Amino acid sequence: MQENLVIVESPAKAKTIEKFLGKDFIVKSSFGHIRDLAKKDLGINIGEGYKPVYEIPGDKKKVVDELTKLAKSKTVWLASDEDREGEAIAWHLTEVLGLPVDRTKRIVFHEITKRAILEAIEKPRTVNMDLVNAQQARRILDRLVGFELSPVLWKKVRPALSAGRVQSVAVRLIVEREREIIAFRSAAYFRVVAQFYAAGDPEKTLFKAELSSRFETEAQAETFLQSCIGATFTVAKAEEKPAQRYPAPPFTTSTLQQEAGRKLGMSVSQTMSVAQHLYEQGLITYMRTDSVNLSQQALAQCKEEITKLYGEKYSRWFNYKTKTKGAQEAHEAIRPSYIERQEIEGTPAEKKLYDLIWKRTVASQMVCAELDRTTITIDMSGSSNQFVAQGEVVRFDGFLRLYSESTDDDQAAESGEGLLPKLTAGDRVLPSQITATERFTSAPARYNEASLVKRLEELGIGRPSTYAPTITTIINRGYVVKQNRDGQKRNYAQLTLTGEKIASKTLSENYGKEKNRLSPTDIGMVVNDYLEEQFGPIIDYNFTASVEKEFDRIAEGDITWDKMIDEFYGPFHKMVDSAITTQTAKTREVRILGNDPKTGHIVKARIGRYGPMVEIEGNEGEKGRFASLKKGQLIESITLEEALELFALPRDLGQLDGEELMVGIGKYGPYVRYGKSFASLAKTDDPYTIGYDRAVEIVRAHQAAAAAANTPLKSFPEDADMLVKNGRYGPYIAYKGKNYRLSKGAKPEELTLDDCLKIVAGSKK
């Protein structure tokens, strides 16, 4: 029997740790939580001080049995992660395995390295019940909210809906942003940019300067350009200032999620999954943290690595302070376990994320970039308007040699020019060209996953462990969709003054293109509106942030968890009772869009049985015509013209082999129908625009697949009824009008008649 049993959450983590410990240690995984609130009913005894009712899920009983046997070892070490969730796992293990909570050894570490593991073994502690209670309070509160809110939504909105405390706030943010976009009205203006060169410069080296004023109309812009003809342009002032650009601090959970989204295109959940693998392999420190601190050892390793790669002048120690609201346990920032290790083996995603973490960590300890920023202000005779030229030159790259932080803006911000000419006040400059270009104000950008995490963190809502599951949940519930939008084409005017002539032309551009942006669905908007109306305080941003602070106070031992729950539950339960009894409409609002020009009948948008739709009312006593909204369309913003386009389906594309070829949308999505057969369209095919040739291609592929399915993979002359076929879900046996599934891994081409008869006989038992 081993002297010591170490219990961790995951098999990968167990495998890594076992390499560092001797033969006296056995390391086993609990595979996450070994028990949870009972799934049947509420799982909380409200009348007994909110006492939770825990149960061991069926899929964990085998794990628990094994750990119970092994727990008879001399010493049990609980090595789950060092956060509230990990502390709760450790406590549940003591409860289920019958271990004394006040004597069982609890070890924690930020990184899975031999040094860290052995240090933890040297300094064990016991389970921190304050951290356990904070996690338990969150779990109980979220169960209470979900359990009591969901039936209200079933009754008042639509069956099978659900709501959550933090998730509902995230949906609210996305809904509010969508309504800002719907309400936004773009305004045109004209931006004036000149290309100047210094008088007396034989090379006529050009530099760009922008007019400090903007014009609302093309006529105003043209009038200004007319005034530039023959005008004198003189430098009013030229300022040159040294500047520094500081490196970004090492990654926290949220900044890693944001930067991985911007630089690598990873979703929040993908980032956390890859980071988890890196951590369990001992390659990075713990990935759920809101700290930007680095250990003294890590700082020393960074200095050594920077000096080796770039020289000592690039190294500087930075001590960063955590600014996040309610930052939790004193973890380190996310960093490589071994700073000297620049590259790793692994999947492409693991390599990319590790490289990002390595660069950010090392760059955080490099010197600032040294810049020269120049601003030249140019006066124009006969006008109060001024042109301004800005230039920026990097004199010493510092940390920029290794890493530069991205921004949330999809379009790179226009930076100033590089080196500007040496000019002083009173110097004359001459215009080579002055251009007035029509621009347009932009609507607020929809959130992507990274910017939503950033906003939640700014509001103090959620914690490092909750961001990814929150986003996953609201998408899975159908309240939010992540989608791309093709840009739209628009024309814009441009006036150019060259010499004494003004040329005018119309150009075109695409705008509004989006990738992986979060939009609310119609049902998401309906649920949000209902929750705001009936449960406004619960999804209030400040209130949700204050609940997080209460969890923090529990973790610090300042308040008891049951008191905190009681103060929340009383007012909340009254809201639930009020919402159930009030005669609130089911919020199935109908939006009248106008009248159908062909029939004069009313066209309206609403949520139907199968989702958002539009309807053209029929004559009295007759049914109307219905059409589903396209992905990305909303009841709240769809126009009459867009709604009428939806009734273009089904479309008649002509004849194929003497049969009608039709395109439409059915219960299971877009399809092509030829005769009595149906073939699904690919995701890239638009039923409103698909042409005849593409439809025929889909039909022929469908026919070929059907023919292949009807052709037996194997037949037997001695029994004509026995056939081995290839079906939609794989190979199967067809025998005397019935079908029989093959076992996983069976090779249909190797089956004999006896094999097939045994399968048939076995299925009948």
Predicted regions and their residues:
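Intrinsically disordered, low-complexity regulatory segments
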Residues: 1-140, 148, 153, 318, ...
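Basic, low-complexity terminal or inter-domain segments flanking catalytic cores
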Residues: 2-5, 16, 23, 71-74, ...
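Metal- or metallocofactor-binding catalytic centers and their adjacent structured scaffolds
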Residues: 216-250, 257, 424-428, 435-437
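Accessory interaction regions appended to the cores of large information-processing enzymes
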Residues: 22, 29, 38, 151, ...
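A conserved hydrophobic secondary-structure block that centers on an alpha-helix together
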Residues: 257-259, 263-270
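Short glycine-centered, acidic/aromatic-flanked micro-motifs in structured strand/loop junctions
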Residues: 80-82, 258-260, 288
